[in-house]
Design a protein with these regions (language model features):
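Hydrophobic adenine-recognition pocket in adenosine-nucleotide-binding enzymes
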Residues: 74
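Hydrophobic/aromatic residues located in beta-strands of well-ordered beta-sheets
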Residues: 28, 41, 98-100
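A conserved beta-strand element that flanks and buttresses the S-adenosyl-L-methionine
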Residues: 70
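Conserved class I S-adenosyl-L-methionine
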Residues: 26-32
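Adenosine-cofactor binding site in Rossmann-like domains, unifying the SAM/SAH pocket
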Residues: 35-62
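Conserved alpha-helix/loop element of class I SAM-dependent methyltransferases that forms part
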Residues: 6-26
């Protein structure tokens, strides 16, 4: 039963987060998604998005207005990792989800693209999901519950890290393990 539950979670987590956003009238945002936009999402990108902006300057949305963010292959192009994670947390509602994919430093993909200016791997997310690591960056406000952080290896020795995180903004009891 546990194995099947895990399989179903991996298959449907993002769809369930999207449905929850719809039910609660929260936005669904695709950061940097103008090349391959996710259906039903508003795109925030440098050009050709629903909202065009420089993500290095922040996310131009109200606090707590977003239910789910898709951030596929974008955060490595943002100069300040702490700022973009802080902005993602700011715009997400309590219990809002972010689904991140980023080239990992465990492979060549993080280094080969000249537009990459920040570098990530599975451990990079600990500073926002684990209290003992958050202390190293004086992080007392950005809190995420970690549901999935893993790395897969693709062709040409390109490793991709996925992080599925849920924003914590209240002391509400939550399912699953919480380390922050």
């Amino acid at each position: 039963i546990q194995q099947k539950t895990r399989e179903l979670f991996l298959m449907y987590a993002q769809q369930l987060a999207e449905r929850d956003a719809d039910i609660n009238n929260k936005l669904k945002i695709d950061l940097g998604g103008s090349i391959n936009p996710r259906k039903g999402y508003q795109v925030i990108d440098w050009a050709d998005g629903t909202i065009n902006c420089d993500l290095n300057e922040g996310i131009p949305l109200k606090d707590n207005s977003v239910g789910v963010i898709n951030a596929s292959h974008i955060i490595q192009k943002i100069r300040d990792p702490l700022k973009i994670i802080s902005e993602i947390h700011r715009v997400l509602c309590d219990g809002g989800w972010v689904f991140i994919e980023v080239p990992s430093t465990d492979g060549r993909g993080a280094w080969q693209d000249p537009t990459h200016v920040s570098y990530w791997n599975e451990n990079s997310f600990w500073y926002y999901t684990r209290k003992e690591k958050a202390n190293y960056i004086s992080n007392t406000k950005i809190r995420f519950q970690e549901f999935r952080i893993n790395t897969r290896l693709e062709e040409h020795n390109i490793a991709i890290t996925s992080a599925w995180l849920c924003a914590i903004k209240s002391n509400e009891r939550r399912p699953h393990t919480m380390n922050i």
